[in-house]
A protein has these predicted regions:
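Generic structural "secondary-structure junction" signal
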Residues: 13-15, 32, 65, 69, ...
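Acidic, metal-coordinating catalytic segment for phosphate/diphosphate chemistry
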Residues: 2-41, 45-47
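Active-site segment of metal-dependent pyrophosphate-handling enzymes
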Residues: 38, 58, 90-127
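A glycine-rich, hydrophobic loop/mini-helix early in the fold
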Residues: 39-73
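The catalytic Nudix box helix
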Residues: 52-53, 70-104
Length: 127
């Protein structure tokens, strides 16, 4: 994260085809229970096929102490999924995605899949 980064960044709002149609602060998106924004999630998998699944911190507002994806983050306004994957993987895991094997597993949407946001899910292979 950059030093001036806040938890109230702007997120792009998207239509049912994942095209940007506007933007709102993250706090407004959650206060209004919107699902038309973008996120990325990734699973780190080693050469044995083992997945690293961390436990969320006790002080997390949503799902404290629950098991989670290896990495997850919001796509900030002006970013695309790949930019966010690179930024969040560096911030959360100190992994440079340019030096890892990354594969898109799929795209999920609130309309088709019942998830909380438009979501790209990735696999990051490394030991």
């Amino acid at each position: 994260m950059t030093p001036d980064h806040t938890l109230d960044e702007f997120l792009d709002l998207v239509d049912e085809n994942d095209n940007v149609v506007g933007k709102k602060k993250r706090s407004e998106v959650y206060a209004e229970h919107l699902s038309n924004f973008r996120v990325v999630n990734a699973f780190v998998v080693n050469s044995k096929g083992e997945i690293w699944i961390p436990r969320r911190a006790a002080n997390k507002r949503i799902f404290p102490l629950c098991l989670d994806m290896s990495m997850g983050g919001h796509v900030e306004s002006g970013e695309n999924y790949e930019d966010t994957l690179k930024r969040e993987t560096q911030e959360e895991l100190n992994i440079d995605t340019d030096k890892a094997q990354v594969r898109l597993l799929g795209h999920l949407s609130p309309q088709k899949d019942g998830v909380s946001a438009n979501m790209n899910v990735y696999e990051i292979k490394m030991d």
